[in-house]
Amino acid sequence: MSVPTVLERIVARKFQEVAERSARVSLAEMEHLAKGADAPRGFANALIEQAKRKQPAVIAEIKKASPSKGVIRENFVPSEIAVSYEKGGATCLSVLTDVDYFQGADEYLQQARAAVSLPVIRKDFMVDPYQIIEARALGADCVLLIVSALDDVKMAELAATAKEVGLDVLVEVHDGDELERALKTLDTPLVGVNNRNLHTFEVSLETTLDLLPRIPRDRLAITESGILNRADVELMEINDVYSFLVGEAFMRAEQPGLELQRLFFPEQVKKTVQQLD
């Protein structure tokens, strides 16, 4: 399996992280914490129901930094951003918990989820069942499995662990081979297509459009990365894609929730402006 260099470094660090964390909190203790966590909020169902109505099902991301862009947002208060997103019409939230490469934190997920009623995905690089159980203990409702970071056996193992603890799974692919592996290995309804090439970090919305015909109708295609303006949203919607994961476009805006409205619900922005007038 060829893994992109940046991803390879991140994955190697994740194995170290699991060893460090499980030395501090044992697997048995983590399982106990997971059992005591708030009930899952139904991440997949929320997206599916919204998309069925042909309404934008937006997973709004809370992300301070990235390896390719550095710090994206200086004024970073996860609870405030979460509330802004909920008011703006987000269906779900995505919170980065990776510390070393994205300046995320477990606490950010907890703070964001406590501030709203929306389901939340733990956005991190899952390589071990411990992290899945940890995600549930933190209160996450869904986890991300990145096909290019996992072999099929590990992918299936992580998905099985997620099911055991009541977590939904969003599987992420960025080419046809990965899509084939994901569909063969997992039965999750959520298939994310990352428009960012993990080898080059270049972004092309054609990635989603190219893979779309190969995604079965009983799965929900979610386009990730590169949605920056109304034209991008409309391009997806005319191709019957109503589920989006967007981070950077919102994080760079002064008011993330208002930017979400501008991109996905422009009619509501007009109404708000008229009310203010």
Curated annotation (Swiss-Prot):
It catalyses: 1-(2-carboxyphenylamino)-1-deoxy-D-ribulose 5-phosphate + H(+) = (1S,2R)-1-C-(indol-3-yl)glycerol 3-phosphate + CO2 + H2O. GO terms for biological process: L-tryptophan biosynthetic process. Disulfide bonds: none annotated. It holds the Pfam family IGPS. The keyword Lipid biosynthesis does not apply. The keyword Amino-acid biosynthesis applies. Gene3D superfamilies: Aldolase class I. Keywords: Amino-acid biosynthesis, Aromatic amino acid biosynthesis, Decarboxylase, Lyase, Tryptophan biosynthesis. Its EC number is 4.1.1.48. Transmembrane segments: none annotated. One of its GO terms (molecular function) is phosphoribosylanthranilate isomerase activity. InterPro entries: Aldolase_TIM, Indole-3-glycerol_P_synth, Indole-3-glycerol_P_synth_dom, Indole-3-GlycerolPSynthase_CS, RibuloseP-bd_barrel. Pathway: Amino-acid biosynthesis; L-tryptophan biosynthesis; L-tryptophan from chorismate: step 4/5. NCBIfam families: PRK00278.1-2 (NF001370), PRK00278.1-6 (NF001373), PRK00278.2-4 (NF001377). Belongs to the TrpC family. This is Indole-3-glycerol phosphate synthase. It comes from Pseudomonas putida (strain W619). The lineage of its organism: Bacteria, Pseudomonadati, Pseudomonadota, Gammaproteobacteria, Pseudomonadales.
